[in-house]
Amino acid sequence: MNGVATTAALNLARHLQGAGITNAEVLAVVAKTPRELFLDAALGHKAYENTALPIGQGQTISQPYIVARMTELLLESRPKRVLEIGTGSGYQAAILAQLVDELCTVERIKSLQIQARQRLKRLDLHNVSFKYGDGWQGWANKGPFDAIMVTAAASSVPQALLQQLADGGVLVIPVGEETQQLMRVVRMGDQFHSQTIEMVKFVPLVNGELA
């Protein structure tokens, strides 16, 4: 990052800390990750604003606060192998890849997946596996996972994702249609314990259809 971007990223991390993000590792990674790399050049001047922005194909790059909050929730269990549903721009994947040993990420829109792969390569992040597929189905032959993060809102919690959680694993997922809640689900044997975190607004998690 150039000096201006570095300062802007540090200021964003400070803003997120003021907004309630407490995990120092998450804040440090936000402060050194060039968010402008994940946006069209025309939106680059907005890269370090705490707002969601369009990335094409009807999708968005999530608000930095939500990226940090979901990452913080996921890291509470100290996961090593993580599944991300909805690669999108690749920004959330870039944050996660710097904090976990192995990241697997699934995207249903081929053009977005190609761009995200190129961006993570530019950042020299090589602990990421990419799949073009239906996020509702997860990535069964790569599981089980210590944690799963879903970056689009599901109408209900996908059963396939619950089954791909390791015992003690954590699923962080927005659930709902018009009204959405961020949920944290923990697997304990065959039992699943869910906790509502806060109200959120995400694009929908599309079931089955690839683009």
From Swiss-Prot:
Gene Ontology BP annotations: methylation; protein modification process; protein repair
Coiled coil: none
Gene3D superfamilies, A to Z: Vaccinia Virus protein VP39
Any single Pfam family the record assigns to this protein: PCMT
A GO cellular component entry from the record: cytoplasm
InterPro entries: PCMT, SAM-dependent_MTases_sf
PROSITE patterns: PCMT
Active site: S62
Subcellular location: Cytoplasm
GO MF, any single term: protein-L-isoaspartate (D-aspartate) O-methyltransferase activity
Keywords: Cytoplasm, Methyltransferase, S-adenosyl-L-methionine, Transferase
Entry's EC annotation: 2.1.1.77
Catalytic reaction equation(s): [protein]-L-isoaspartate + S-adenosyl-L-methionine = [protein]-L-isoaspartate alpha-methyl ester + S-adenosyl-L-homocysteine
SUPFAM superfamilies, sorted: S-adenosyl-L-methionine-dependent methyltransferases
Family: Belongs to the methyltransferase superfamily. L-isoaspartyl/D-aspartyl protein methyltransferase family.
Job of this protein: Catalyzes the methyl esterification of L-isoaspartyl residues in peptides and proteins that result from spontaneous decomposition of normal L-aspartyl and L-asparaginyl residues. It plays a role in the repair and/or degradation of damaged proteins.
NCBIfam families reported in the protein's UniProt record: pimt, PRK00312.1
Protein name: Protein-L-isoaspartate O-methyltransferase
Source taxonomy: Bacteria, Pseudomonadati, Pseudomonadota, Gammaproteobacteria, Alteromonadales
